């Protein structure tokens, strides 16, 4: 029975840790999910804190998961996990009854569950929790070495949170991930299917130019919050657009704003002459970084950069001269390996140390 209780606790820990880490890797996506929950609960007045709430919840999930895996502070961690699981079970039961058009966001963009699937998942977690922690006064003592492995894992998770807040996700699970091929809105059966990578754009007069995304080598800068861009960031965008044009790319800016706001925000002709307008949520999905860039080759999303790491002209020339398949692999496999290495390292610390 002791082994069964320990295995149950570790299984819950894995679920919590993975759920937290996936949301930590994509803080913008986690914030969007929290905003959806706040809207559903009629608590939109808290939207200004959505980012903090999302990151805080993700960090708490990951740390509680690490605590269960390592076995430290079992009673406190067990109570906290039990309360959280019970709360989310009640919330998902309410979601199941109301069936709003929203995703649970349990595992970020990696895994999408229906409300019923989420409810069943939480019920299973509750059953495992009861098996692992009841009665609370009969929990096994923790090996002393685990009080060393947990802080190492915790510091690593916090460091990953800080890193993720400054970059785009190491692994992109959105419909607009590298390797995805854009589709025209008229070519899909269900226009409400958010998992299909469609992007519609128009000029200042409202005329649509969706076909432009299917033509040639595009360097697309996406701006979903014009007001938050600083002068030095505008300078970086202008430099990228100049370098892209000089290297043979078609520079394009997609903004979730009105033409008048764009003209008030910048006077650079490199930006204004290349600007089209698109849906804010689509731009957030295309690139999590406000002012980030995406290389699109004849409708194929090749790679992306955040505003802090925009490519220089030498990098653009390298990509332009390379085979698109090679670029797709070389530009994205490195980040995927970094994420896998991070997970292996943290799990090794928690399980083997």
Language-model segments: what does each one mean?
Residues 86-138:
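Membrane-embedded alpha-helical segments of integral membrane proteins
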Residues 159-220, 227-239:
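Membrane-interface segments at or immediately adjacent to transmembrane helices
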Residues 252, 269-288:
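Short, internal strand/loop/helix patches
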């Amino acid at each position: 029975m002791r082994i069964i209780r320990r295995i149950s606790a570790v299984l819950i820990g894995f679920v919590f840790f993975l759920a937290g880490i996936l949301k930590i890797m994509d803080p913008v996506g986690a914030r969007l999910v929290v905003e959806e929950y706040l809207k559903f609960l009629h608590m939109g007045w808290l939207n200004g804190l959505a980012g903090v709430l999302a990151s805080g919840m993700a960090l708490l999930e990951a740390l509680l998961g690490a605590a269960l895996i390592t076995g430290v502070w079992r009673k406190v961690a067990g109570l906290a996990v039990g309360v959280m699981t019970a709360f989310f079970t009640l919330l998902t039961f309410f979601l199941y009854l109301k069936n709003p058009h929203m995703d649970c966001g349990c595992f970020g963009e990696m895994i999408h569950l229906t409300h019923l699937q989420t409810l069943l998942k939480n019920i299973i977690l509750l059953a495992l929790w009861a098996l692992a922690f009841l009665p609370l006064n009969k929990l096994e003592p923790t090996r002393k070495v685990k009080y060393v492995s947990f802080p190492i894992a915790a510091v690593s998770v916090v460091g990953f949170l800080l890193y993720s807040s400054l970059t785009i996700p190491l692994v992109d699970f959105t419909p607009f991930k590298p390797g995805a091929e854009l589709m025209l809105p008229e070519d899909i059966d269900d226009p409400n299917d958010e998992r299909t990578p469609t992007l519609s754009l128009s000029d200042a007069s409202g005329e649509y130019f969706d076909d432009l995304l299917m033509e040639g080598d595009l360097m697309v800068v996406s701006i979903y919050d014009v007001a938050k861009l600083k002068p030095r960031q505008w300078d970086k965008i202008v430099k990228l657009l100049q370098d892209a044009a000089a290297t043979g790319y078609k520079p394009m800016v997609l903004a979730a704003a009105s033409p008048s706001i764009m003209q008030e925000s910048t006077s650079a002709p490199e930006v204004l002459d290349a600007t089209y307008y698109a849906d804010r949520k689509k731009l957030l999905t295309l690139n999590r970084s406000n002012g980030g860039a995406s290389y699109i080759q004849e409708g194929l999303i090749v790679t992306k950069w955040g505003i802090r790491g925009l490519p220089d002209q030498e990098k653009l020339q390298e990509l332009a001269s390379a085979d698109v398949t090679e670029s797709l692999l070389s530009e994205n496999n490195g980040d995927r390996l970094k994420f896998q290495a991070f997970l292996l390292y943290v799990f090794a610390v928690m399980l083997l140390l």
